[in-house]
Design a protein with these regions (language model features):
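A translation/RNA-centric and nucleic-acid-associated enzymatic feature enriched
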Residues: 1-127
Length: 127
């Protein structure tokens, strides 16, 4: 629905949705400093399908540990991950593009398995 509305209003089939609630995003997503209920993250929708998710990551050790604790996680279980925060990392972000999802939408396929080289389902778990 949102993609259709943006296509009609702005002539684009791509829509960025930003500032997802913190409780709905992973432990490494940076909270918005102006309103920590939300994150500095986004989804890119294309024709109604999420084709990428991304955002700014937490880069401060104390902030990361506090968020893990808030989400009920044990920071000791993530000692290797936390090492980069403890000994220094710079502000950074990331995203993951779903190429098969994007290809499915571009080709008008109803199922992403039609655009995967080795699709998986309940009967096929190996190539």
């Amino acid at each position: 629905l949102i993609s259709r509305l943006f296509a009609e209003e702005y002539g684009s089939e791509f829509v960025f949705v930003t500032h997802y609630p913190s409780k709905k995003r992973p432990f490494y997503a940076a909270d918005d400093p102006e309103d920590p209920r939300y994150t500095l993250s986004f989804d890119l929708l294309f024709r109604g399908l999420e084709v990428t998710t991304g955002g700014q990551r937490i880069h401060d050790y104390d902030t990361q540990v506090a968020k893990m604790l808030k989400k009920g996680m044990n920071p000791e279980d993530f000692a290797g991950y936390l090492m980069i925060h403890k000994y220094g990392t710079c502000p950074h972000g990331g995203l993951g593009l779903g190429l098969e999802r994007l290809t499915a939408r571009l080709l008008g396929e109803n199922n992403v398995r039609e655009t995967c080289l080795f699709p998986r389902d309940q009967q096929r778990i190996e190539p």
